[in-house]
């Protein structure tokens, strides 16, 4: 709900999310992802003022680009996690937030280690052939022949390290 709010305050995002959650819960108890201020980089602002979900199945989103973001953004997410909020990294990229530049393996490894430490689920940007540094596939890729970009190769190497079995998380 509300992907990448730019400058809206949490109170406004929360009010909107509560209305949408009430409608969704009439039909489904599936996980709902809720955005937060500054392009989903301030999930900690929801501590003590969480959205209302009768199914207790909400996660707060977090976005980063390894070439742009660092310790400050990780700190915001860590505050949220330590404050008891479930976090889902619903967008991360290997390059810069503007889509330019090339992946920095060292900065990306710092972020991957951080996600592993907190056992965070994530979705990488972008499994596409778009003309930007974070695209996973080169323009010559086809459905039959995938050609990975440097970003795609890096993401593929991270995904290859994922566990093949999982444990259920503790619930409140």
Where are these regions (language model features)?
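Extracellular glycoside hydrolase catalytic/binding regions
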Residues: 3-121, 125-129, 134-163, 168-170
């Amino acid at each position: 709900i509300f992907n990448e709010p730019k400058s809206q305050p949490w109170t406004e995002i929360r009010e909107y999310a509560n209305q949408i959650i009430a409608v969704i819960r009439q039909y489904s108890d599936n996980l709902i992802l809720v955005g937060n201020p500054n392009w989903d980089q301030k999930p900690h602002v929801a501590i003590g003022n969480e959205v209302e979900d009768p199914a207790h199945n909400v996660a707060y989103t977090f976005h980063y680009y390894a070439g742009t973001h660092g310790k400050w953004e990780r700190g915001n997410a860590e505050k949220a996690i330590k404050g008891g909020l479930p976090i889902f990294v619903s967008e991360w990229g290997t390059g810069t937030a503007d889509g330019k530049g090339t992946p920095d393996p060292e900065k990306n490894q710092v972020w991957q280690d951080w996600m592993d430490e907190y056992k965070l689920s994530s979705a990488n940007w972008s499994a596409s052939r778009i003309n930007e540094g974070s695209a996973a596939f080169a323009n010559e890729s086809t459905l039959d022949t995938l050609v990975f970009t440097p970003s795609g190769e890096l993401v593929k190497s991270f995904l290859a390290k994922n566990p093949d079995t999982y444990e259920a998380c503790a619930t409140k």
